[in-house]
């Protein structure tokens, strides 16, 4: 059985849909929203690598590595901000994060 482009696009579409549903259905927990954004970025990376492979172009794979780097930094910074916010306020609910002073 040969894994074609349609298989990669199907998996990517499923991951993207799960990420969007995670953002829209869970509006109370910031950690779940961050994980949903990571799922969306993973779906984009799968698309880039799949098209790069099937078009015999390396640029998509290199760009996917840059996206993975930015996604890892975004997750680390986001979780660090949430830890500090939880220590100060005792909650990481979206309603509490929206009321930040700054």
Swiss-Prot record:
It is a multi-pass membrane protein. Keywords: Cell inner membrane, Cell membrane, Membrane, NAD, Quinone, Translocase, Transmembrane, Transmembrane helix, Transport, Ubiquinone. The chain crosses the membrane at residues 5-25, 31-51, 65-85. GO terms for cellular component: NADH dehydrogenase complex; plasma membrane. Its EC number is 7.1.1.-. InterPro entries: NADH_UbQ_OxRdtase_chain4L/K, NUOK/Mnh_C1-like. Its main location: membrane. It comes from the Bacteria. It is found in: Cell inner membrane. It catalyses: a quinone + NADH + 5 H(+)(in) = a quinol + NAD(+) + 4 H(+)(out). GO terms for biological process: ATP synthesis coupled electron transport. GO terms for molecular function: NADH:ubiquinone reductase (non-electrogenic) activity; quinone binding. It holds the Pfam family Oxidored_q2. Belongs to the complex I subunit 4L family. NDH-1 is composed of 14 different subunits. Subunits NuoA, H, J, K, L, M, N constitute the membrane sector of the complex. PANTHER family: NADH DEHYDROGENASE SUBUNIT 4L-RELATED (PTHR11434:SF21), NADH-UBIQUINONE OXIDOREDUCTASE SUBUNIT ND4L (PTHR11434). NDH-1 shuttles electrons from NADH, via FMN and iron-sulfur (Fe-S) centers, to quinones in the respiratory chain. The immediate electron acceptor for the enzyme in this species is believed to be ubiquinone. Couples the redox reaction to proton translocation (for every two electrons transferred, four hydrogen ions are translocated across the cytoplasmic membrane), and thus conserves the redox energy in a proton gradient. This is NADH-quinone oxidoreductase subunit K 1. It comes from Rhizobium etli (strain ATCC 51251 / DSM 11541 / JCM 21823 / NBRC 15573 / CFN 42).
